[in-house]
Structures are given as C-alpha cells and as structure tokens.
Amino acid sequence: MSFLSKNGAGILACLLISILSWYLGGFFPVIGAPVFAIFIGMLLHPFLSSYKQLDAGLTFSSKKLLQYAVVLLGFGLNISQVFAVGQSSLPVILSTISIALIIAYLFQRFFALDTKLATLVGVGSSICGGSAIAATAPVIHAKEKEVAQAISVIFFFNVLAALIFPTLGTWLHLSNEGFALFAGTAVNDTSSVTAAASAWDSLYQSNTLESATIVKLTRTLAIIPITLFLSYWQSRQQENKQSLQLKKVFPLFILYFILASLLTTLLTSLGVSSSFFTPLKQLSKFLIVMAMSAIGLKTNLVAMVKSSGKSILLGAICWIAIILTTLGMQTLIGIF
C-alpha cells in the first residue's frame, strides 16, 4: 500500500481543517490557528471517528508532522541575536521557568495528576505555550488527549492574560520597558504576547512590541535544554538499567531543531537576511496547525472536559506563580 493511499484521507482532513483554522486565526490572533484547529477537530470527532480510513493519516499528522514542525521551528531562532538583546531578561526568564516546572512536578506528586499532562502544562506555561507543548509531546510520548488538554488550558490563560495585562500593567504603574519584560515573560504564546504588547502600545503610543517579542524568543530557547533533559529522563524510565541508545536519549528531530537554530545563527552572521527564513517559519506554524487538527479529531471533547479539573487548577497555579515571580524579579533587577 502506497503512502498516499494509506495516509491520504487523514492528511486531507487535517489539511482542510487547518486551512479554515489558519484563516480564523488571522481574524482572531488572540486565539490563534492551533487552538481553532484543535477545537474544530474535537467538534468533528463524533462524526468522523467511525471512519477508520482516516486513522493512519491522523496518526502521521499528529506525530510525524509535529516533529517536522519542531525542526522547522529552529529556523526562527537566531541564538546570538536573542542572547545579545534578551540577556537582561534572563534572570526573570530562568526564575519563572524554574518555578513553573517545580510547581508542575509537585502538583502531579501530591494531586495524582498524570505526569505527562502535568509536564505539558508546566512547559507550556513556562516556556512558549503551544510550541513548547509541540516539542515536548513526542519526547515524552504524550497521548493525543493529553496534548489537547494541555493546549486548551494554556489557551484559556493566554486569552485571559492578553485581555487583562495592559490594565494590570497600568494599575501597577509599569514603565514601557517593564511592561515589555512582563508581557514577554508572563504570557506564554507569541500571539498573545503580540496582542498584549500591541494593546499597551495603543494605550501609551509606545514601542514595546519588539522588546516583548525578543523576550518571548529568549524564553523559546529553553525548549532545547528542557526537551533534552526530558528525553534523557524518559529514556532512563524506559530502559532502567539497560544500556541507553543515543537515538532514544536524544530524538533526531530535537537534534535537527538545534542544528536548524545553529544554521540560522551562522547564516545571519554571514549576512543572510532573516526574511530568508520566513517561509520555513510559516511552514512550521502551519504544520503545527495540521498536527493540532489531527489531535483534535482523535480527542473526545466530552471525556476531556470531564477530566480537566486538575489540569485547569495546575494551569492557574502556574500562571499566578509566573506573574508573581516575574513582578518580583523585575523589582529586584530594577526593570519595573
């Protein structure tokens, strides 16, 4: 059986949902195309779940396309530029990532939340939302319903942050520089960071958007050490005392992601325009939307809602902790 005859129907279903979601995401950037894709997929699940000819293509899209998307994501990271501009925000970023991951670990231990779901919520809250979840899910072998649940939790607090942060920043008397650092650190998805910073700029005729985006990109770099650590930890759990294979410890798609980041950094240092990589970054985003479509189509919405209480609570605790840690660290380093 050829690849297309086996996977074509499922991939086509994901493609159609993704095109619609991409269009809707352009109109409602606070929500974003990946969230539209996952929810449209879940709404269609009751009607399409009986069509078994879709299964192979959905599995390919939710796993392989997601890995390809993560590799292409590397072409959006110029490591030297991010470090040069974003280094002043590193103490805040490292503090918030650490506190969120510690909370996620303790929560799953004391409240019996599934470890993989807690991990996804933790990395999604602390690093960069859907992109971090997309990179982490294949590494820890998370199930589709766990990915869908984590994305849904992150989405809720993303929208909430984009709506209330400009008002909160005004109430706290944040400077323009302070709000850029606050939004770039305490909001976990690029679209929501953009929405919050743009709203602030509209209120105060400032230019915080670029700074907030660079802080966000600096956070994105944490995907590399976090996924490598989780991959090693997962391999240790599976292999126990058996010898570990390099491919199992460090999945190839993560290594390719790192190589893509290094290649981008090298080429831009040699004079290649960053716009050269724009098509690859856009393709990465679209493949993530396709993967989310597949995950949505494989997820029972009713069952997910019934089991979401603990994950929403974890998301809320992580979100509040990140806000408080960000503001506390900003006060300490004098960027308020």
Swiss-Prot record:
Signal sequence bounds: none
Presence of keyword Methyltransferase: no
Pfam families: Cons_hypoth698
Keywords: Cell membrane, Membrane, Transmembrane, Transmembrane helix
Membrane topology, from the record: Multi-pass membrane protein
Subcellular location(s) of the protein: Cell membrane
Any one Gene Ontology cellular component term annotated for this protein: plasma membrane
Top-level taxonomic group: Bacteria
Transmembrane regions listed in the UniProt entry: 65-84, 91-113, 118-140, 153-175, 211-233, 249-271, 286-305, 312-334
Similarity annotation: Belongs to the UPF0324 family.
Name of the protein in question: UPF0324 membrane protein spr0034
